[in-house]
Amino acid sequence: MSKEDNVINSFEEQANELMKERFQKLKELQSNGKDPFDVYKVERTHTSKEVKDNYEDLEGKTVTVAGRLMSKRVHGKAGFSDIHDRYGKIQLYIKINDVGEEKLKEYKTFDIGDIISVTGTVFKTKTGETSIHITDFQLVCKSLRPLPEKWHGLKDPDLRYRQRYVDLIINQDVRDTFIKRTAIIKSMREFLDNRGFLEVETPILSPIAGGAAAKPFITHHNALDIDMYLRIATELYLKRLIVGGFEKVYEIGKNFRNEGIDIRHNPEFTAIELYEAYADYNDMMEITENMIAYICEKVLGTTKVEYEGAEIDFTPPWRRLTMVDAVKEYAGVDFNIIKNDIEARTIAKEKHIEFKKELKDCTKGDVLIGLFEEFCEDKLMQPTFICDYPVENSPLTKKKRGNEAFTERFEGFVFGREVCNAYSELNDSIVQKERFMQQLKERELGDDEAYMMDDDFITSLEVGMPPTGGLGIGIDRLIMFLTDTHSIRDVILFPTMKPQPNNQ
């Protein structure tokens, strides 16, 4: 057993004893007709922030605040306490002359973590701290499980993620991260709404998992007696809306991929996808860099952010680099002179590149992407668009104008990590069907992330989709950069965790 496990177990043993004391206090309250769980509503007049921000107007006036008791320094006939609410903390002062001996005795029985409402007059202490002089109070929720003292005993990150409610109570930095998360998504909506985009909702359950190369979660619809999939992307439904005449659409929502968990991946994650008719991938680059700059200015007040000790500059324009040029620059391989798959495989063998399928089945495009991932990605620290992906690896994308071996696709990289993916969308139904057929062959070769055939999507393209630009951004990863957060679990309120045995 590790030292950390011993600390946690020790805390749990202490907590169990303290819980017994708290249960006894609750029983006494209930027997005296003061059951805190009989309180239905608190007539709160102000938050802690409102009291502090409006001190000059509120000085000497009576207010009612409510929050969680987080410190208590009451000895003898008077003392101070702190309560925390959504907006911060405020100091309380209680004195026997104002509340009486019995009420002060009751107040002293309150535990850290209890939720109370307080009525009193606003004043400042000799040290200048805005406080409330208590004239009345009420226990509105009894905390039966004690909080760890300053997070002692919950240093294990897994326990923090499992008990995020405690993490949020104790850790102001965690609260700030999730408040920023909300502000980031709000700013993203503002930017797109101001440009005339329409926010929509598309199915989460679908008979086909499409729009990305990923393993889906499978479930079963009992009434229809069919297997269905949790969506891995919103792309194909959003394109149907472009066909239907909604020329600018976006969706912010959850996607689900039945894959590994690490500091960059969670099986359930939030993404935005947007599509604009009569646009191409160059327009998507402009939207990406300007939207992220807008978010940075709105939420952080600057386009230069610090991430893991390095400065990242999101000021437009971002660097633009083709994948071929990136591989030439960082891997020392010039794909302009590689003639065929055989030559490419030779390079892959020399560079010790590994693939999910056998090397003999790899194409020139597979090798290019393999070299890029191995030698280039981690070099892309500042925001960079990597453009023009091989056609065989981009089944939903138009071919590159002037070079049909490539497609008009880009991915945005920051700090060596992909944050977005965009295309000049393929709208030729005949070519799209051929691409899907090729993807089916890839599945037969063992690639369980290859695309499925979606006949209804083909039908929609046959009706006719205008030239369209499309963009997808991983919101969780973007938030990591804008909040200087190392793990994706720290920007998801309740990340996916392996269940613990009932006795733990």
From Swiss-Prot:
Enzyme class: ligase
Entry cofactors: Mg(2+)
Entry superkingdom: Bacteria
Binding positions (Mg(2+) 1): E411, E418
Locations listed in the record: Cytoplasm
Binding-site positions, Mg(2+) 2: E418
GO biological process: lysyl-tRNA aminoacylation
Matches recorded under HAMAP family: Lys_tRNA_synth_class2 (MF_00252)
The protein's assembly and partners: Homodimer.
Record protein name field: Lysine--tRNA ligase
Species in which this protein is naturally found: Clostridium botulinum (strain Langeland / NCTC 10281 / Type F)
Phylogenetic placement of the source organism: Bacteria, Bacillati, Bacillota, Clostridia, Eubacteriales
